[in-house]
Curated annotation (Swiss-Prot):
Official protein name in the record: Penicillin-binding protein 1F
Keywords for this protein: Carboxypeptidase, Cell membrane, Cell shape, Cell wall biogenesis/degradation, Glycosyltransferase, Hydrolase, Membrane, Multifunctional enzyme, Peptidoglycan synthesis, Protease, Signal-anchor, Transferase, Transmembrane, Transmembrane helix
InterPro entries, alphabetized: Beta-lactam/transpept-like (IPR012338), Glyco_trans_51 (IPR001264), Glycosyltr_51/Transpeptidase (IPR050396), Lysozyme-like_dom_sf (IPR023346), PBP_transglycosylase (IPR036950), PCN-bd_Tpept (IPR001460)
Topological relation to the membrane, as annotated: Single-pass membrane protein
Primary site of residence: membrane
Superkingdom as given in the UniProt entry: Bacteria
Family in the record: In the N-terminal section; belongs to the glycosyltransferase 51 family. In the C-terminal section; belongs to the transpeptidase family.
Cellular localization per UniProt: Cell membrane
NCBIfam families with a match to the protein in the record: PBP_1a_fam
Gene: pbpF
UniProt-listed SUPFAM superfamilies: beta-lactamase/transpeptidase-like, Lysozyme-like
Gene Ontology CC annotations of this record: outer membrane-bounded periplasmic space; plasma membrane
EC id: 2.4.99.28, 3.4.16.4
Length: 714
């Protein structure tokens, strides 16, 4: 009998030991598995980054989740209590799991024959939201419990509550209590009332169902329930609860205005962060950065709105596209960039898409280098003839050739033959070297590049950047979209400090500016209206499939403040899709964008120690000449020559004498219509003529015939 009693006593001891052992193993497993499952990086809540323009105004937020993490100390006590009251009233008593709630949930799950009720504590919800999926399975619930227990071991209750409130989803793309406070009440979380806190606490259970915007009645009903629970649990008095329940929801929803005009610019900001500063798009979306950009919001919006107007596009249908970019002359920062008429985020950005630049290339590849190399000047005469260079025969667009024209006129009227002739004179490699210095590196080797005939082309951004060199007195600065990037701690992790490099002299740049002004005043860029100084160049390329069709149309130019380039055409040109007119349309568009943005009335200022480019001397034929003998002192004869002088007193007149069939240059005078030859011989038989001379072109004009002096004029 004693043995039987001993045996009965031994069995419970064995069970107790085994239970203790299994409990120990379970506890160790929870600790080990909990730490194994927890990825502490996930506890670092992502914050949205913001983009601010040149005035410091926020223009966009970048985020995967619209979230603004805050410290627990910034969240009012009664707001915290509203969430505790409804989500986990024993939060400060349990160690990760609430046995009573779990028991109730298990009982209801058994009755339902499956997993239907959560019974989760705030810590468990935090574990689920950060580390686990949202499926309702017993395995997921087990992991949730394990992680929750370990979170309770590693973090204080206040820290857990802080993380919980910062990761909750409040609907409408808003994550975290601070972002929710901004969105629904347009105020800081620290300024929330108990009623407003209850409004927010009502949302997370079913963000769509209890949205105070979509379903205000349902939200108010749940808010009032939460206020009642706060009273029941001793957080507020009955009077406070009744007073709060009597209030309206008090929403002051922050307007989330759609700003599609910023989309193409923002995409270029993200691209530059990746390419230039090795900050990935994902990092920008999650890092809480402040990205300062040189954006001019007014100019950006104006360009977007103007470019949407169909009247600017001479296409075969309404689907012709366009792109524009504008750069600050002082900094080189991009103030506006439009990637398309209906650009969508992450779409085909035509700001960086390459196209054939046409005649906009002439100042960059030909005339700028020609002046800088001191081989030609603005009024140097260039050959304007139909001639072939091997198998390449460039033609003027109007098929008219003048034999010789000045560089200034060749640019003003966009003549092709002189441009190709000049490039041939200075050398293709010379032209390419200047293009490369201006940010355009191309493989093309032929003379066709004088006219923008390239294998691939250039982008509006590249073209604007290159023209900016002239506007910046000959210094090239690579266009940029990011001024600086500041992290959450206020540290500057990226800062634009690029120094420009000298490409053209100030004199060359000023001469080019003056010539390009003539293009706008009387040349190919007269279309449209602009009040203020503007220098620029048109360009277009032909579509050979249809007679008279245009493939690409351009205007690139600059004011004293802004440089820009506008392109228009089709993404794919074919027999049914082409422009029916050329560069006059982007020229007018360019002018209207700046005018409507208020960028008018500015005047170019000549740099110090730079000579002004004189206006061209336009010689008229000298047709009338009189030559008479006159008496002077001591009875000597003087020959007096008189002719019709030019209005331009800079004109020089050469006096030629012909004696015995031999012509000799006797003298020259400037700005006069008369000349005297003293001590004349009445019997010399000499005759005289006058020929005008242009000191700019180094060429003579049309002069008079030879005339013999008369002793007595009638």
């Amino acid at each position: 009998m004693f043995k039987i009693k001993k045996k009965k006593l031994f069995i419970p001891i064995i069970i107790l030991v085994l239970t203790a052992f299994l409990a120990l193993i379970g506890y160790i497993s929870i600790i080990f598995l909990g730490h194994y499952v927890i990825d502490e990086k996930k506890l670092i809540l992502h914050a949205s980054s913001k983009i601010v323009d040149q005035n410091g105004d926020e223009v966009a937020s970048l985020y995967t989740e619209n979230r603004e993490p805050v410290s627990i100390n910034e969240i009012p006590k009664q707001v915290r209590e509203a969430f505790i009251a409804v989500e986990d009233k024993r939060f400060y008593e349990h160690h990760g799991i609430d046995a009573k709630s779990v028991g109730r949930a298990v009982y209801r799950d058994i009755l339902a024959g499956g997993k239907v009720e959560g019974g989760s504590t705030i810590t468990q919800q935090l574990a689920k939201n950060i580390f686990l999926t949202h499926d309702k399975t017993f395995l997921r619930k087990t992991k949730e419990v394990i992680i929750a227990i370990n979170l309770e071991r590693d973090y204080s209750k206040d820290k857990l509550l802080e993380m919980y409130l910062n990761q909750l989803y409040f609907g409408h793309g808003v994550y975290g209590i601070q972002a929710a406070s901004h969105y629904y009440f347009n105020k800081e979380v620290k300024d929330l009332t108990v009623s407003e806190g209850a409004v927010l606490a009502a949302i997370p259970k079913a963000p769509s169902t209890y949205s105070p915007i979509l379903h205000p009645d349902k939200n108010k009903e749940r808010r009032d329930t939460i206020l009642g629970m706060m009273n029941d649990q001793g957080y507020i008095s009955a009077k406070e609860a009744v007073t709060a329940q009597g209030r309206t929801l008090g929403l002051h929803v922050k307007k989330q205005s759609e700003t599609p005009w910023f989309d193409s610019y923002i995409d270029l900001v993200i691209k530059e962060a990746e390419d230039k500063y090795s900050i990935s798009g994902e990092q920008l979306l999650q890092g809480g950065y402040t990205i300062k950009v040189p954006l001019d919001s007014k100019l950006q919006k104006t360009a977007y709105q103007v470019m949407k107007e169909g009247s600017y596009y001479p296409g075969t249908d309404q689907n012709a596209e366009g792109s524009a970019v504008f750069i600050n002359n002082k900094t080189g920062g991009v103030e506006a960039a439009i990637g398309g008429r209906d650009y969508t985020s992450k779409g085909y950005n035509r700001v960086t898409a390459v196209r054939q630049p046409g005649s906009t290339f002439k100042p960059l590849a030909v005339y700028g280098p020609a002046m800088q190399e001191k081989k030609f000047k603005p009024y140097s005469l260039l050959k304007d003839e139909l001639q072939s260079y091997g198998d390449y025969t460039p033609k003027n667009y109007d098929s008219r050739y003048e034999g010789e024209v000045t560089m200034s006129d060749a640019i003003t009227y966009s003549k092709n033959a002189p441009a190709v002739w000049t490039l041939n004179e200075i050398g293709v490699e010379t032209g390419k070297s200047y293009l490369k210095a201006n940010g355009i590196d191309i493989p093309d080797e032929g003379l066709a590049l004088a006219l923008g005939g390239l294998e691939k082309g250039v982008s509006p951004l590249q073209l604007a950047g290159a023209f900016h060199t002239f506007a910046a007195n000959g210094t090239y600065t690579e266009p940029f979209f990011i001024s600086s990037i500041i992290d959450e701690d206020g540290e500057t992790i990226a800062d634009h400090k690029e120094e420009g490099k000298r490409v053209f002299s100030k004199q060359t740049s000023w001469n080019m500016t003056r010539m390009l002004q003539q293009v706008v005043k009387k040349g190919t860029a007269t279309s449209g209206t602009y009040h203020g100084d503007l220098a620029g160049k048109t360009g277009s390329t032909s579509y050979t499939g249809v007679s008279g069709a245009t493939k690409d149309a351009w205007f690139a130019g600059y004011t004293p403040k802004i440089t820009g380039a506008v392109w228009m055409g089709y993404d794919k040109t074919d027999q049914n899709h082409y422009l029916k007119a050329g560069s006059s349309y982007p020229t007018r568009l360019f002018k209207d964008i700046l005018t409507q943005a208020g960028e008018t009335g500015h005047v170019f200022t000549k740099p110090k120690n730079v000579k002004e480019l004189e206006s061209p001397i336009e010689l008229k034929p000298v047709k009338t000449l009189t030559a008479d003998y006159t008496f002077k002192a001591a009875g000597l004869f003087t020959i007096e020559l008189k002719w019709d002088a030019q209005e331009d007193d800079r004109a020089v007149y050469r006096i030629y004498v012909n004696k015995d069939g031999e012509e000799t240059l006797l003298d020259s005078v400037e700005g006069k219509g008369s000349y005297e030859i003293p001590y004349a011989n009445l019997f010399s038989g000499a005759s005289y003529k006058i020929v005008p001379y242009n000191t700019q072109t180094k060429r003579e004009g049309e002069g008079t015939d030879y005339v013999q002096p008369k002793l007595f004029s009638s």
